[in-house]
Curated annotation (Swiss-Prot):
Belongs to the PsiE family. This is Protein PsiE. One of its GO terms (cellular component) is plasma membrane. It is found in: Cell inner membrane. GO terms for biological process: cellular response to phosphate starvation. Keywords: Cell inner membrane, Cell membrane, Membrane, Transmembrane, Transmembrane helix. Induction: Expression is under the control of the two-component regulatory system PhoQ/PhoP. It comes from Salmonella typhimurium (strain LT2 / SGSC1412 / ATCC 700720). It holds the Pfam family PsiE.
Length: 136
């Protein structure tokens, strides 16, 4: 097999980058549709008289924020020169674990472990935002 020239490698990288960008754009549009559906679901849960609907409302709010954070991550990717900032993934991780605590809080040990994971992610976020590691 012959080695590829530098211009061909750059062409391949450009094609793959464009496929990635198109995929992320499509994912962003799908997430916007899901965000709209979640808005309708939240409105239904808000005006439902049952007590169980209040738990659905809280769970739906956290899911809403997850959609919102993923859309913000995609927007940030395109605005920052095709780069995913690490701290946005940490924000999404924290929100996902909070949702897990709200939805699945069966044993105190699980809640304690989830809380420790959140603490670890907050420490990671603090380190990422410190002057030594800050890129922006």
């Amino acid at each position: 097999m012959m080695p590829l020239s530098r211009s061909r490698l750059e062409f391949i990288a450009t094609i793959l980058q464009n496929v990635l960008n198109l995929g992320l754009l499509t994912l962003g549009l799908i997430l916007v549709v899901f965000l709209g559906k979640e808005t309708v679901h939240l409105a239904d849960a808000l005006f439902a008289p049952e007590q169980a609907s209040k738990y659905e409302l809280v769970e739906g709010l956290v899911i809403y924020f997850l959609y919102f954070e993923f859309i913000a991550l995609i927007v940030k990717y395109f605005k920052s020169g095709l780069h995913f900032p690490l701290r946005y993934f940490v924000y999404i991780g924290i929100t996902a674990i909070v949702r897990l605590i709200i939805v699945d809080h069966k044993t105190p040990m699980d809640v304690l472990l989830y809380s420790a994971a959140i603490l670890l992610l907050v420490i990671t976020l603090w380190l990422c935002n410190s002057n030594r590691l800050r890129r922006e």
